[in-house]
């Protein structure tokens, strides 16, 4: 009986254990089933999306940057594609060892390493950074064969910007560079991060900066299937990028080259405008720089050479260099007298070679005695005494109020950034400019110097050119602009850029005629007669000599005894043809002396180019560069021939090892269309476009 009870007890315990185990298994399976239902039903959509995202990746498609062209369709900025070797620091265990291992496959210079270190300091560790750009085909092949050895290192096809004419118009075209933190913040503020995904570059200067929105394009996206290692396997879907628009400039690159060549190694600036439209035909600052240096990130040596150069090649003298206008100010002083009624053109003033005011003697060059002067003769012969007395009669406030609407000391609003205001002085300006009370008072004697464009006067060549164009256009002022139109790269549709309405300053036609006649007299019987001898057209102009340093009352200017950078600047303002001007300009050659001897010859060759289609002979070009030219010498060359050489020379340059990204057909189409939007075009040079493969101020007073 005892054994039977024990067996029954064991069986009872066993059944209890089986029941507990069964219940435990049932609970476990219930929990698993519940979890399965939860994952498969309630979380199905979310988990499916996560799984799909692990299998696929959304990649940005960087748009082709738009082209930049001159008024005749010549390409000034384009793109080409090339392979770049890039490293993502967060995916590499030892950067130094990786770079060392790469060097037998790909040439990596010390400059490449320095740039990589700088980019790494400026960027986040998960961003891919270029260690070498523009790989050769052989380097691409060598790395591709060894790619498995280098996790975190990739070959990427990138678009690169190219400026085929180098320094030519570099200050106008500008350049692109890597996006810095300030620019990233601005992009985020504008909610434009999506459009810059996959993009490392942005316009930094010139047209590249001002028209960034048009040139950049719209970033596309593509959905890619990826492997477990995260590499793209195949494209699942795509929304293509929209290329940037082509920006068409009013600039004539042939004229630009002519002027830059005439400057040679000298410093200075020239701005040429169409007075009827405000289009900028030439915008020269010398010396210049090559924007190609900045595309990949300029190296330290090149940066120091540019930034520390005494000649300041990075300074856009046409936009930011300020100078006294010298005697080129006199025609505008004459207009002020006529328009305000302070003095008529027939009033006679005796010029004994000096002007006495407040016990101080204001002299003329070499104390020349001009004799009896009316307004016409005073402009033609550039009488200082006449305009000393006129400034005294007008007073500083009247001078200021008349000159401001002409654009002197004002921002013109040209369509590139960085313009400076300069100084158009009056009593209020002096009170704000100087801190010490005894310096804030305006003295009557300070007004006298303003009459001949000296004293506190300090303007840009852009302002002087705009004022000259306004006078040439009968007192109607146009806003200067470099860009004329944009072209859609897909539809080829051209959209002219809206221009500000012209401003009529209300000048009397009779008064304008008096001053313009005197300016024509300067070229026919005055200070620039020899320079314009033999010209088959009439032009108006005014020579000027602007002081770089102030000469004491009892001192005499002696060029031979002065340091080169203390010598006077040569200035000239002009327009042509005289009866119906289509071009107006202002030019300065720093520390070169008399305007008639150095600056006016440059203007003459510009007019011959625009009006006659003539390019200086080699001997004439050399004479201009040396500052000894007067009228042209030798057999002039044809502009069309020189343009053909310019384009052929560019095509023969060493090209990058890649095809141009911009289609040749698009470039040719834009070139053909360029002339149709050149309102007021002076001429269109016939060219055939070929597919391209790849000092804070200008002076110290």
Model segments located where?
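Beta-lactam-recognizing serine transpeptidase/beta-lactamase-like catalytic domain environment
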Residues: 2-6, 225-238, 275-328, 332-586, ...
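Structured catalytic/translocation cores of nucleotide/phosphate-coupled proteins
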Residues: 41, 69, 515, 586-587
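Intrinsically disordered, low-complexity charged/polar segments
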Residues: 493-498, 622-636
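Cofactor-binding loop segments of dinucleotide-utilizing enzymes, especially the Rossmann-like FAD-
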Residues: 177, 381, 590
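Periplasmic/cell-envelope proteins involved in peptidoglycan metabolism and beta-lactam response
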Residues: 1-302, 310, 322, 347, ...
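C-terminal soluble interaction/assembly domains
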Residues: 586-589, 602
């Amino acid at each position: 009986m005892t054994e039977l009870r024990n067996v029954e007890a064991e069986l009872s315990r066993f059944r209890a254990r089986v029941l507990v185990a069964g219940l435990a298994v049932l609970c476990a399976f219930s929990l698993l089933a519940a979890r399965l239902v939860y994952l498969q039903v309630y979380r199905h959509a979310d988990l499916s999306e996560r799984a799909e995202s692990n299998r696929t990746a959304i990649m940005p498609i960087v748009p082709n940057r738009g082209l930049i062209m001159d008024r005749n369709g010549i390409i000034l900025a384009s793109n080409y594609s090339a392979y770049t070797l890039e490293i993502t620091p967060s995916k590499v265990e030892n950067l130094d060892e990786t770079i060392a291992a790469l060097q037998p496959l790909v040439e990596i210079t010390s400059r490449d390493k320095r740039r990589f270190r700088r980019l790494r300091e400026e960027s986040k560790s998960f961003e891919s950074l270029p260690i070498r750009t523009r790989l050769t085909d052989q380097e691409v092949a060598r790395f591709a064969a060894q790619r498995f050895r280098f996790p975190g290192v990739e070959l990427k096809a990138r678009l690169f910007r190219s400026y085929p004419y180098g320094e030519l118009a570099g200050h106008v075209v500008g350049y692109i560079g890597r996006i810095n933190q300030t620019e990233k913040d601005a992009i985020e503020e504008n909610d434009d991060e999506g459009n810059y995904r996959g993009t490392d570059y942005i316009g930094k200067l010139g047209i590249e900066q001002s028209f960034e929105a048009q040139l950049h394009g719209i970033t596309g996206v593509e959905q890619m299937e990826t492997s477990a290692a995260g590499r793209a396997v195949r494209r699942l879907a795509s929304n293509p990028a929209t290329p940037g628009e082509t920006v068409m400039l009013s600039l004539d690159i042939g004229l630009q080259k002519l002027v830059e060549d005439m400057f040679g190694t000298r410093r200075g600036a020239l701005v040429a405008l169409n007075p009827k439209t405000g289009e900028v035909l030439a915008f020269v600052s010398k010396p210049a720089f090559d924007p190609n240096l900045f595309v990949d990130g300029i190296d330290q040596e090149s940066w120091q050479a540019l930034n520390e150069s005494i000649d300041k090649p990075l300074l856009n003298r046409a936009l930011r260099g300020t100078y006294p206008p010298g005697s080129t100010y006199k025609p505008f002083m004459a207009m002020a007298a006529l328009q305000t009624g302070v003095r008529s053109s027939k009033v006679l003033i005796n010029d004994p070679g000096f002007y006495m005011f407040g016990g101080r003697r204001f002299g003329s060059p070499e104390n020349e005695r001009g004799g009896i002067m009316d307004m016409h003769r005073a402009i033609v012969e550039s009488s200082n005494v006449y305009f000393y007395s006129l400034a005294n009669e007008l007073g500083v406030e009247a001078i200021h109020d008349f000159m401001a609407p002409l654009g002197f000391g004002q921002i013109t609003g040209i369509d590139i950034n960085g313009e400076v205001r300069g100084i158009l002085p009056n009593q209020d300006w002096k009170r704000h400019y100087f801190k010490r009370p005894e310096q804030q008072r305006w003295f009557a004697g300070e007004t006298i110097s303003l009459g001949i464009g000296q004293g506190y006067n300090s303007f840009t060549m852009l302002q002087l050119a705009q004022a000259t164009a306004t006078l040439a256009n009968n007192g109607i002022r146009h806003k200067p602009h470099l860009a004329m139109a944009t072209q859609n790269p897909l539809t080829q549709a051209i959209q002219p850029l809206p221009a500000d309405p012209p401003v009529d300053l209300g000048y009397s036609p009779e008064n304008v005629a008096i001053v313009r006649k005197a300016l024509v007299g300067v070229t026919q019987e005055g200070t620039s007669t020899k320079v314009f001898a033999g010209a088959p057209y009439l032009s108006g102009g005014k020579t000027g000599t602007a002081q770089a340093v102030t000469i004491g009352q009892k001192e005499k200017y002696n060029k031979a005894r002065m340091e080169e950078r203390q010598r006077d600047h040569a200035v000239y303002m002009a327009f042509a043809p005289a009866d119906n001007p289509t071009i107006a300009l202002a030019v300065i050659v720093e520390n070169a002396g008399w305007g008639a001897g150095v600056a006016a010859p440059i203007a003459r060759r510009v007019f011959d180019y625009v009006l006659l289609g003539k390019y200086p002979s080699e001997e004439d070009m050399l004479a201009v560069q040396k500052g000894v030219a007067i009228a042209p010498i030798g057999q002039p060359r044809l502009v069309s021939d020189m343009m053909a050489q310019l384009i052929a020379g560019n095509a023969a340059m060493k090209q990058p090892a890649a095809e141009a990204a911009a289609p040749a057909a698009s470039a040719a189409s834009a070139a053909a269309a360029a002339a149709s939007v050149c309102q007021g075009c002076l001429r269109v040079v016939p060219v055939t476009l070929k597919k391209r493969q790849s000092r804070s101020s200008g002076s110290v007073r």
